[in-house]
Structure formats: structure tokens, C-alpha cells
């Protein structure tokens, strides 16, 4: 175990004793803290690379656009923490760099973003085997996914370049994670 795992175990044990948690609740709390710590670590790595490459704001815009939709739309996940790092760097560092340096046609990006909103409308929310969506929440998550992706698309009609393309990129990336091609592989 590393330093952070030890600290997480200590804090989870403290919470277990303080709140009279049973063993299952203790494991859930510990897992939640481990996931949070890993995600914070990934964000630090990703944003540090973006800062070094002088694309911090573009990575941030892309990531926020992606996350605002993903929160409700869900979608495919990387098969492991390692692949999550690789995918995060590819999607939120490499793709923004490509959009920035190759000056992707505005009309093409607008068209792809519009198609992506259609994908969100058709497939959101997309549950996974590891992250099922309770039936009572599906309708609400679908509604918010559609509303948020539509609002983000409308915002791109009024925001100046290059920021528009990074909002659109976030919409496109999230829509791709909703496509059914990922779900046969995941199961």
C-alpha cells in the first residue's frame, strides 16, 4: 500500500468508528475516497500537462463541456485506470492541440457538434455494466442530457473563436462515449 492508500484507510476507519458503519458501509466509504483520490490525481496530471503546453484554458473548456453532459448522459468508461489516463490525455490534451494548431473548419465542427447533440438525444443516458442507472432516474437524466447539450450548442453560436470549437469538442467527445459500439465490448 502507498502513502495515500494508508491515509484513506485510516480516515475510513475513523469514519467507521465515529459513525458506527458496518463493514459494507466502511468498504463503500473507502472505495469512494479511493476513486476521488485517483480522479484528483488524473486531473492534476492532465491540467499540468495542459499548462505546460500552454493550452490550459482550452483543455478546461473542453473538459467542462464534456463533464456537464456526462454527468447526466453517462457513457463508456476506460477499462482500467491506466487507460483512463491515456484516454484523458488523448481526448483533453491531444485533441485540443490538434483543433488549435490545425484550424479545423468552423462549419465542420458546427456540423459535428450538431450531429453529436442528435446522438445525445438518441442514446442518453447510456448505462454501463459497472454503472447502471436506476430506472427511476433514466427519464430525468435523459431530459437533462438533452437540455445541457442543446444549451451548450446554442452557446457556441454566440461565443467567439477559438472557444466555440472547444465547447463543440467537449460535446463531440461525450457523444462518442454514448455510441452503442462500446457496450458489446464492455460486457
Curated annotation (Swiss-Prot):
SMART domains for the chain: AgrB
Transmembrane segment boundaries: 49-69, 82-102, 107-127, 143-163, 164-184
Listed InterPro entries: AgrB (IPR006741)
A GO cellular component annotation in the UniProt record: plasma membrane
Keyword flag Transmembrane: yes
Chief location: membrane
Subcellular location: Cell membrane
Alphabetized UniProt keyword annotations: Cell membrane, Hydrolase, Membrane, Protease, Quorum sensing, Transmembrane, Transmembrane helix, Virulence
GO biological processes: proteolysis; quorum sensing
Keyword Ribosomal protein set for record: no
Topology of this chain in the membrane: Multi-pass membrane protein
EC category: hydrolase
Domain of life from the UniProt record: Bacteria
Signal peptide region: none
Role summary: Essential for the production of a quorum sensing system signal molecule, the autoinducing peptide (AIP). This quorum sensing system is responsible for the regulation of the expression of virulence factor genes. Involved in the proteolytic processing of AgrD, the precursor of AIP.
Protein name stated in the entry: Accessory gene regulator protein B
Species of the source: Staphylococcus aureus (strain MW2)
Amino acid at each position: 500500500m502507498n502513502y495515500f492508500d494508508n491515509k484513506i484507510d485510516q480516515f475510513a476507519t475513523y469514519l467507521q468508528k465515529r459513525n458506527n458503519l458496518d463493514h459494507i458501509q466502511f468498504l463503500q466509504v473507502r472505495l469512494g475516497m479511493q476513486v476521488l483520490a485517483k480522479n484528483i490525481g488524473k486531473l492534476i496530471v492532465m491540467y499540468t500537462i495542459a499548462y505546460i503546453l500552454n493550452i490550459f484554458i482550452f483543455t478546461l473548456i473542453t473538459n467542462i463541456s464534456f463533464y456537464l453532459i456526462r454527468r447526466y448522459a453517462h457513457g463508456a468508461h476506460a477499462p482500467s485506470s491506466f487507460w483512463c489516463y491515456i484516454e484523458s490525455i488523448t481526448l483533453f490534451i491531444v485533441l485540443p492541440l490538434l483543433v488549435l494548431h490545425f484550424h479545423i473548419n468552423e462549419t465542420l465542427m458546427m456540423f459535428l457538434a450538431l450531429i453529436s447533440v442528435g446522438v445525445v438525444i438518441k442514446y442518453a443516458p447510456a448505462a454501463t455494466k459497472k454503472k447502471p442507472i436506476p430506472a427511476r432516474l433514466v427519464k430525468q437524466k435523459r431530459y437533462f442530457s438533452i437540455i445541457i447539450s442543446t444549451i451548450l450548442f446554442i452557446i457556441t453560436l454566440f461565443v467567439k473563436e477559438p472557444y466555440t470549437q472547444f465547447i463543440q469538442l467537449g460535446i463531440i467527445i461525450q457523444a462518442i462515449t454514448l455510441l452503442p459500439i462500446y457496450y458489446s465490448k464492455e460486457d
